[in-house]
From Swiss-Prot:
Assembly notes: Component of the TIM22 complex.
Protein name: Mitochondrial import inner membrane translocase subunit Tim10 B
Lipid metabolism in keyword set: no
Cited function: Component of the TIM22 complex, a complex that mediates the import and insertion of multi-pass transmembrane proteins into the mitochondrial inner membrane. The TIM22 complex forms a twin-pore translocase that uses the membrane potential as the external driving force.
An example molecular function term from Gene Ontology annotations: metal ion binding
Gene Ontology cellular component terms for the protein in this record: mitochondrial intermembrane space protein transporter complex; TIM22 mitochondrial import inner membrane insertion complex
Cell compartment(s), UniProt: Mitochondrion inner membrane
The entry's keywords: Disulfide bond, Membrane, Metal-binding, Mitochondrion, Mitochondrion inner membrane, Protein transport, Translocation, Transport, Zinc
Membrane-protein topology: Peripheral membrane protein
Motif Twin CX3C motif: where in chain: 24-48
The record's note on its domains: The twin CX3C motif contains 4 conserved Cys residues that form 2 disulfide bonds in the mitochondrial intermembrane space. However, during the transit of timm10b from cytoplasm into mitochondrion, the Cys residues probably coordinate zinc, thereby preventing folding and allowing its transfer across mitochondrial outer membrane.
Upper lineage: Eukaryota, Metazoa, Chordata, Craniata, Vertebrata
Record-stated family: Belongs to the small Tim family.
Biological process according to GO: protein transport
Amino acid sequence: MDPQGQLRNLRDFLLVYNRMTEICFHRCSSNFNYRNLTMDEERCVDSCAGKLIRTNHRLMGTYVQLMPAMVQKRMQEMESKAAEMAKAEAEAAAKAGTSVPDNPSSAITNASMMSPSIQDIPNTSSTAPNGFQILSSPDNTSDIKTSSMTNGSAFGETNLHVITNDAKTFTNQSLDELITPSPVNTSVPETPTAGGAGQTPS
């Protein structure tokens, strides 16, 4: 039963209880102010009080029997409300977390527009000294090897020509030194004497 229906039932019960009490006591006496009750009035009041006490006992017994079921029902209602709130929060978080555009192609297009273009990168290919050319595409290793071998052969021919000229010069100089006779030393060495060093014998 909904809370509004429970309140209506409780209100109706209290109205009936109050009306029954008024009828019972008014039947005993119309005025209870500042006077003592007679014997008949006392017996009537005692009868009405007994009826109210028995009614209250039955009401409390019924409440004790229904109280566990009422508490269980309230707990289930609270748990269901908490589960609904948690589910609503989870759905809201999922919607907030999955706020990604539905079209993946548009996302890829935006990402490509944000990333720097490959054409904007400057060309780093240049010509190094001594004829060694750095190619812009290092993947073609055959071209690099061919260029290196060609430049190396030209460099080797130049060095070989210089070495050949140096060898010829060295050969001519060595022949001139061999042909030119070296001076022969014909002087007699001096013999030291007792008279003093550096005197020749007579």
